[in-house]
Amino acid sequence: MFLFAGLGNPGPKYAGNRHNIGFMAVDAIVRRHRLSPWRRRFQGAVSEGEIAGEKVLALLPETFMNESGRAVAEAAKFYKIPLENIFVFHDELDLPPAKIRVKKGGGNAGHNGLRSITAQCGNDYWRVRLGIGHPGDKSLVHSYVLNDFGKAEREWVEAVNTACADFAPALIGGKAEDFQNRAHLFLEAQGFTDVKPLGGARAS
């Protein structure tokens, strides 16, 4: 069994925030692969079904970002899901907008959701890093991630979510690099090759 966890904050107030792109991506996967309706369990919203012939649990923790690990750990423990079968979809300041990278293990890059999961579960889970760019100054990060995507950003956000949904079977099949490459080619074909964060700030 596999666990796809999207990171974000619960409730309509945060639904459109840049910090919630992980929620958006996992919701797109659930819709694309017709998993079950969302229900409340494991301190979050869950949906179940099959992707590429394997059982998948989708989870959106409702603990708020800083406590995401509680929900992920509870679900993983209940279903005995090993770390190598856990994929965490999250916003990534250190990637330009519309870039997707996948890696197993590594640091948390200041991301409180990842920090919580690592503390609760260990480090060797997969991160699906969804680039949102950087506002240009550390002092601006908090307001940047907790603001909604602007109208000019919505096309690439939708394309990123589509890529995650369409190519999710590659993650299930143990082909993380293939997922990343196919997502890159898809986003490139859509014209999202050099997207800048709103305001022209850096995206390193």
Swiss-Prot record:
* Gene3D superfamilies, sorted: Peptidyl-tRNA hydrolase
What are the residue positions of the site described as Discriminates between blocked and unblocked aminoacyl-tRNA? N9
Q: Could you tell me where this protein is found in the cell?
A: Cytoplasm
Provide the GO biological process annotations. Answer: protein quality control for misfolded or incompletely synthesized proteins; rescue of stalled ribosome
Question: EC?
Answer: 3.1.1.29
- Which keywords annotate this record? Cytoplasm, Hydrolase, RNA-binding, tRNA-binding
> Which GO terms label this protein's molecular function in UniProt?
peptidyl-tRNA hydrolase activity; tRNA binding
Q: What is its main location?
A: cytoplasm
Q: Which Pfam families match?
A: Pept_tRNA_hydro
* Record site feature (Stabilizes the basic form of H active site to accept a proton), residues: D91
Q: Where does tRNA bind?
A: Y14, F64, N66, N112
NCBIfam families cross-referenced by the UniProt entry: pth
Subunit annotation: Monomer.
Query: What is this protein called in UniProt?
Result: Peptidyl-tRNA hydrolase
Q: What is the species listed in this Swiss-Prot or TrEMBL entry?
A: Azorhizobium caulinodans (strain ATCC 43989 / DSM 5975 / JCM 20966 / LMG 6465 / NBRC 14845 / NCIMB 13405 / ORS 571)
Gene of origin?
Answer: pth
